[in-house]
Amino acid sequence: QLGKGRKLDDDVNVLLRFEGGAKGILHASQISVGEENNLNIRVYGENGGIEWHQKEPNTMLVKWLDQPTQLYRAANGYLGKNAAAATRTPPAHPEGSLEAFANIYKNFANHIRAINEKRKLSKDDPALDYPKIEDGVRGMAFIEAVVKSSKGNAKWTKLDV
């Protein structure tokens, strides 16, 4: 569905098939009345799922089959190294999208600093936790494949990257 003056859809539903056989659904909308940029991410598998809501950014829900939902909060000692490095506020203090982008810029700058200082970084160093050129190219290829599928009567379209 195209909004006035738009070149791409304001509202999309995409069926996905991943390598290994997993299937998914992506729903993205800029026209859901009352949502106010309410980004939600839910991923479900055979044994459980995870859920995150932009309006509650410090909380991640983990849902296992036949177990109670587990709630993880930012800035707590049980988080992994990269999650801890990305946390800028103490527990119970909300972080927002500005901090998320600041983390990307900080990690990129720290990576460049390490290169300039000829320091080797381990594969799991937080300084390497930022989107790479390949991620951007893959994202653009995904959008092109979705548009191609839409123009081709919504037929399955291979993502070539």
Question: Language-model features: where?
Answer:
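C-terminal helix-rich "cap/oligomerization" subdomain common to oxidoreductases
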Residues: 107-161
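Glycine-rich Rossmann NAD(P)(H)-binding loop
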Residues: 27-31, 44-47, 160-161
